[in-house]
Amino acid sequence: MWRTNQVSSRQNMAGFTLIEVLVAIAIFASLSVGAYQVLNQVQRSNEISAERTARLAELQRAMVIMDADFRQMALRQFRTDGEAPSEQILQWKESLLDSDQHGLLFVRLGWHNPQQQFPRGEVAKVGYRLFENRLERVWWRYPDTPAGQQGLISPLLTGVEDWAVQFYLQGEWSKEWVPTNALPEAVKVTLRLKDYGEIERIYLTGGGSLNMTQESVENAG
């Protein structure tokens, strides 16, 4: 009787079998892999969300800056590299500003300089170009610049495959800008982005025309 109880006690104290251990390990491994995949997906989703938020902020910032520039277009000639005043107060030309495509150049108002605290005027020369798939803003502290003075370059938007500008005047849109003494009533900017495709924005300007003779006299003075 005593031996039978001893054998039964030993059997009750026996541990897990090898198969049970392997099954437990397999289940634990499966749960670990599943948990890792879920965690990885959540982390990747957060990264994608952050990237898209940053991209939208970049796009919105570029649009706001362009809106401010176009709304403040000035009826004023400008000088580049110390040369005579430009014939056009708004230039839209191939390779202008070393652009990979067309470049845009004009003068803008509204750059406040209270009590002349900063080494610049309140009227600035501003340009836009497409360079290595980036939309860049090129600007100068003054509208009339001496020879050799380079503009300051501010990257606005990355991933730009193509860009185009159209000009609205007297009820018609034009892909070229011919008038020498006038500004368009509106500017349409079309951008083709790698991620968002083609987007289009229309910006109003002050419009108007300039007496070139009077402007030339004022610039000469």
Curated annotation (Swiss-Prot):
Listed SUPFAM superfamilies: Pili subunits
Keywords, sorted A to Z: Cell inner membrane, Cell membrane, Membrane, Methylation, Protein transport, Transmembrane, Transmembrane helix, Transport
Domain of life per record: Bacteria
Propeptide residue range(s): 1-15
GO terms of biological process kind: protein secretion by the type II secretion system
One Gene Ontology term, aspect cellular component: type II protein secretion system complex
Segments crossing the lipid bilayer: 16-36
UniProt-annotated location(s): Cell inner membrane
Modified residues (N-methylphenylalanine): F16
Database matches in Pfam families: N_methyl (PF07963), T2SSJ (PF11612)
Modification(s) after translation: Cleaved by prepilin peptidase.
Topology within the bilayer: Single-pass membrane protein
The family this protein is said to belong to: Belongs to the GSP J family.
Function as written in the Swiss-Prot or TrEMBL entry: Component of the type II secretion system required for the energy-dependent secretion of extracellular factors such as proteases and toxins from the periplasm. Part of the pseudopilus tip complex that is critical for the recognition and binding of secretion substrates.
Subunit field text: Type II secretion is composed of four main components: the outer membrane complex, the inner membrane complex, the cytoplasmic secretion ATPase and the periplasm-spanning pseudopilus. Interacts with core component epsG.
Full protein name: Type II secretion system protein J
Organism per entry: Vibrio cholerae serotype O1 (strain ATCC 39315 / El Tor Inaba N16961)
Annotated gene: epsJ
